[in-house]
Amino acid sequence: MKQYIVLACMCLVAAAMPTSLQQSSSSCTEEENKHHMGIDVIIKVTKQDQTPTNDKICQSVTEVTETEDDEVSEEVVKGDPTTYYTIVGAGLNMNFGFTKCPKISSISESSDGNTVNTRLSSVSPGQGKDSPAITREEALAMIKDCEMSIDIRCSEEEKDSDIKTHPVLGSNISHKKVSYKDIIGSTIVDTKCVKNLEFSVRIGDMCEESSELEVKDGFKYVDGSASEGATDDTSLIDSTKLKACV
């Protein structure tokens, strides 16, 4: 169940999101009981009408991995590392956190007026990115434990876009109907600049269809109201307009 709290100009959303993915590649492993797991996150943000026009996408991308250390008596218990990706562009500062999830290898953006589209995804085997195969048991554990957070704030960054010249790479997932599962831990949205937010997340095997290894979820925040209805991620954004940020 998703919950949200509006505080001043901030909307805090505790969301749950599942995701499903699948893809094929000549470099997929042929080993039995091995799977190339991936994640695909699609975000559509509609900015407030009064937000100053800024179409400079991909101004900067940073990646930071943090591990929480909890001291218990004389022992130090290390928590699972969380990797944060911060994307600045088009008047927004978007921070995504991933814990025990498939690796993000592709980040892209597009902007059209007050609409900003962003995509973060794994990259399927055979496209020059590392995509290690894991066992079925490890894949099921990843689906169960993967947790994601989103924090979208306003940005006044004025630097030029840093768009890469290579094509946007992706996970080549199936986007078929699959079961839902909680993946999103929390979402923070600064309503000073964000009017609406829609996003979809999928996790699954990138090389073969397997309903047991694919999950998805979606979330909407529209005109001040949060909705648990998952967005149809196949039509959420026009992927052909995305430009590579990394």
Curated annotation (Swiss-Prot):
Name the coiled-coil region(s): none
Disulfide pairs here are none
Q: Which InterPro entries does this one have?
A: Chemkine-bd_vir, Orthopox_35kDa, Pox_vCCI-like_sf
Could you tell me which Gene3D superfamilies the record lists for this protein?
Major secreted virus protein (2.60.240.10)
Q: Report the GO terms under cellular component.
A: extracellular region
Q: Which Pfam families match?
A: Orthopox_35kD (PF02250)
What are the record keywords, sorted?
Answer: Early protein, Host-virus interaction, Inhibition of host chemokines by virus, Secreted, Viral immunoevasion
Where in the sequence does UniProt note compositional bias of the Polar residues kind?
Answer: 108-125
The record's subcellular location field reads: Secreted
Q: Where do the segments described as Disordered lie?
A: 108-132
The family assignment reads: Belongs to the orthopoxvirus OPG001 family.
* Role, per record: Inhibits host immune defense by binding to host chemokines. Binds host CC chemokines (beta chemokines) such as RANTES with high affinity, but not CXC or C chemokines (alpha and gamma chemokines).
Q: What is this protein called?
A: Chemokine-binding protein
